[in-house]
């Protein structure tokens, strides 16, 4: 029943939350599945040469000292290469520059609107209404899928900025459970929309840090008198199962490679380690500091004044108004009445509006927002990584290696694409699958520029994929890195004795029982092999990272060791190339493909929403799919609210439970641990 677990993302980032106990970073949900490493994991062959590749130093795998002349030569080679030697400011920003339409362009747009389908028509002077709530997917969604899609949300902001029928945006902001990377992307679109000169009004009922961070970027922010204020700060929580396992009779045998790897800590320790405390403290500092800076910039208040307000523990929404953090206290209908007055709508008439779903159907072509002849492929990779599609997989919920590889190859074999962007939102997963995708991305990067764009998280297997790109772009608060490995095995002798269970093993081969004899501790020679396997997996990962980032191994070792970094810190340590969102990745792709930055390009989404019957049914809801869909949703919710415990279920029970012989015992353990909650 025992199973060797070599985790590229072994630690579970505990949830960052406000004192209201809601998750503000949703990191536990992001780290839902670890990256499992196969002991037979093998190194891919030599790298082919291409004008798009980095110039890799031979010293990447050589720790021997070199003369200053040699080092200076390497430095000059990197600068000539134009990748490793570049600073963030050397890359194009990709910021939106609003362009006023000339008379001919306005005429063409109005003419096209006359022939728009009825469901794509919008009344002149309409207000685009959108509600931000809960999870926000980085994947495209079909009309059959509920929930928000970041690509469609972003597109709606751009269309509304140029649509002469749209007077402004009324944005309702409800509690969010997405990561800070997506929050930064949405905030950027709010700020870009304001460049059009149109208004954007925010409305917030439950004021947490994420919600206010978005709301304060609007022209005006309103709240009802009964609104909740949870601007109390940030906390990080970590849970440990060492004491639980001790009582149950389970003895975890953990070998971690990298002092910041903490998944093993969750299983074997009863308290947080100094290294994990250090890492989480830095992550917390980065998030809090970024929030204070953003609010200070948006409100025009001094950073220390904002921090002092947080430390007062204000819960009355009236205090936010007095401090100038919101415009006014009004009910939703009062805000609508205000908008009617501003737009000159008669009192007995309704405010003309168009909602998010309908406006998503408005074609960019109608608004004259089509791209140019040059095409850039967008390949979206979101969710945990696996080689093949599972029976409960839903569209966009996982990265299926065989499917993604097919898309990557189609881009590589096609001559119509000038560049490609891999949009990654993944905590990792299967190591073999990660390596296979890394290989395909590397081959693609040898034929045309490839830019990796990171969303909320691109750690472990997610970072593994990104390493193959010609350049990596991440948000300030993207969680990335996590270059490290942990091995975990469980000895169940005491548990078996407690429940009266016995297991006899007959084997052939010296190490045949390494992964199957959980009724006893490892023998010395087995423990040695166990450790060597983990060391080998770690060295492969670390050395490939060093090679990909043109960094000596000893330098990569300093930033690896399983440590998770924010995008900002990852950039200062050479793990990524630039800080920004998808728009910046597109600008860098144009630059590397020798496309003028002011020239329009056509973005081709290869990860289109599925229209197959099973996928449509899975998007409709649990009432159609049945128990499996319902249980999957429940597990997702537990992962968010319970943090490490549900995460542990994903590591221990999901992986070990695949062994049919282990299933009865696993079920008993699940029932027992569930009763302890």
Curated annotation (Swiss-Prot):
InterPro entries assigned to the protein according to its UniProt record, in alphabetical order: ClpP/crotonase-like_dom_sf (IPR029045), Pept_S49_pIV (IPR004634), Pept_S49_SppA (IPR004635), Peptidase_S49 (IPR002142), S49_SppA_67K_type_N (IPR047217), S49_SppA_C (IPR047272)
What keywords does the record list, in alphabetical order? Answer: Chloroplast, Hydrolase, Membrane, Plastid, Protease, Serine protease, Stress response, Thylakoid, Transit peptide
**Pfam families from the xrefs?**
Peptidase_S49 (PF01343)
Q: Is Transit peptide there in the keyword field?
A: yes
- The source's domain of life comes to Eukaryota
User: What GO cellular-component annotations does this UniProt entry give?
Assistant: chloroplast; chloroplast envelope; chloroplast stroma; chloroplast thylakoid; chloroplast thylakoid membrane; mitochondrion
Active site residues per record? 460 (nucleophile)
Alphabetically, which GO biological process terms does the record hold? proteolysis; signal peptide processing
Q: Where is the composition biased (Basic and acidic residues)?
A: 70-90
**UniProt entry tagged with the keyword Hydrolase:** yes
MF terms in GO: serine-type endopeptidase activity
Cystines in this chain? none
EC assignment: the record states 3.4.21.-
**Transit sequence range:** 1-68
- Tell me the function of this protein: Serine protease that may be involved in the light-dependent degradation of antenna and photosystem II in chloroplasts. May function during high light acclimation in plastids.
Q: Which family does it belong to?
A: Belongs to the peptidase S49 family.
Q: Which protein, by its recorded name, is this?
A: Serine protease SPPA, chloroplastic
**Name of the coding gene:** SPPA
């Amino acid at each position: 029943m025992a199973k060797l677990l070599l985790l590229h993302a072994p630690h579970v980032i505990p949830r960052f939350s406000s004192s209201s106990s809601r998750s503000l970073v949703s990191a536990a949900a992001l780290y839902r599945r670890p990256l499992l490493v196969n002991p037979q994991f093998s190194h891919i062959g030599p790298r082919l040469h291409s004008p798009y590749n980095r110039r890799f130093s031979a010293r990447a795998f050589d720790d021997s000292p070199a003369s200053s002349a040699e080092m200076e030569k390497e430095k000059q080679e990197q600068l000539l290469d134009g990748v490793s030697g570049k600073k963030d400011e050397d890359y194009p920003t990709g910021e939106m520059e609003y362009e006023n339409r000339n008379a001919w362009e306005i005429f063409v747009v109005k003419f096209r609107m006359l022939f728009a389908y009825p469901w794509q028509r919008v009344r002149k002077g309409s207000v685009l209404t959108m509600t931000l709530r809960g999870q926000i997917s980085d994947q495209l969604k079909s009309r059959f899928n509920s929930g928000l899609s970041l690509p469609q949300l972003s597109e709606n902001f751009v269309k509304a900025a140029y649509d002469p029928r749209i007077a402004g945006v009324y944005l309702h902001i409800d509690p969010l459970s997405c990561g800070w990377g997506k929050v930064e992307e949405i905030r950027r679109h709010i700020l870009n929309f304001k460049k059009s000169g149109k208004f954007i009004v925010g409305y917030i009922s439950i004021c947490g840090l994420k919600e206010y961070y978005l709301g304060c970027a609007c022209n005006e922010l309103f709240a009802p008198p009964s609104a909740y204020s949870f601007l109390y700060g940030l906390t990080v929580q970590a849970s440990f199962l060492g004491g639980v396992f001790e009582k149950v009779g389970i003895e975890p045998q953990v070998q971690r490679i990298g002092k910041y790897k903490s998944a093993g800590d969750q299983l074997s320790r009863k308290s947080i380690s100094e290294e994990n405390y250090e890492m989480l403290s830095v992550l917390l500092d980065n998030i809090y500091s970024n929030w204070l800076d953003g609010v200070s910039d948006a409100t025009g208040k001094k950073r220390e004044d904002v921090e002092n307000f947080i430390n007062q523990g204000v819960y009355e929404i009236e205090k936010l108004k007095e401090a100038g953090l919101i415009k006014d206290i009004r009910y939703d209908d009062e805000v609508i009445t205000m908008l009617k007055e501003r737009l000159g709508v008669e009192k007995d008439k309704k405010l003309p509006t168009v909602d998010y779903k309908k406006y998503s159907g408005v074609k960019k072509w109608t608004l004259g927002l089509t791209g140019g002849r040059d095409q850039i492929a967008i390949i979206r990779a979101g969710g945990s990584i696996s080689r093949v599609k599972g029976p409960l997989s839903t569209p966009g919920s996982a990265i299926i290696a065989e499917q993604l590889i097919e898309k990557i190859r189609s881009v590589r074999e096609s001559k119509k694409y000038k560049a490609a962007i891999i949009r990654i939102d993944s905590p990792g997963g299967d190591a073999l699958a990660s390596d296979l995708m890394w290989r395909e991305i590397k081959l693609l990067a040898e034929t045309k520029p490839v830019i990796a764009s990171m969303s909320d998280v691109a750690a472990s297997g997610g970072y593994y994929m990104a390493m193959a790109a010609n350049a990596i772009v991440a948000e300030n608060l993207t969680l990335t890195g996590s270059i490290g490995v942990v091995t975990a095995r469980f000895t169940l002798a005491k548990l078996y004795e407690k429940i009266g269970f016995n297991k006899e093993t007959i084997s052939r081969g010296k190490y045949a029982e390494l992964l199957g004899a959980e009724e006893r501790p490892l023998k010395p020679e087995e423990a040695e092999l166990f450790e060597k396997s983990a060391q080998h997996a770690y060295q492969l990962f670390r050395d490939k990272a060093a090679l990909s980032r043109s960094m000596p191994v000893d330098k990569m070792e300093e930033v690896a060791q399983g440590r998770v970094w924010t995008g900002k810190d990852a950039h200062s340590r050479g793990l990524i190339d630039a800080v920004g969102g998808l728009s910046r990745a597109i600008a860098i792709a144009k630059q590397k493909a020798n496309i003028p930055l002011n020239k329009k390009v056509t973005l081709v989404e290869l990860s289109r929403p599925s229209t197959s019957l099973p996928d449509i049914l899975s998007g409709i809801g649990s009432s159609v799919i049945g128990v499996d869909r319902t249980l999957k949703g429940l597990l997702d919710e537990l992962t968010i609210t319970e943090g490490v415990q549900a995460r542990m279920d994903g590591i221990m029970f999901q992986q070990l439970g695949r062994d049919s012989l282990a299933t009865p015992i696993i079920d008993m353990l699940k029932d027992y641990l569930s009763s302890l909650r």
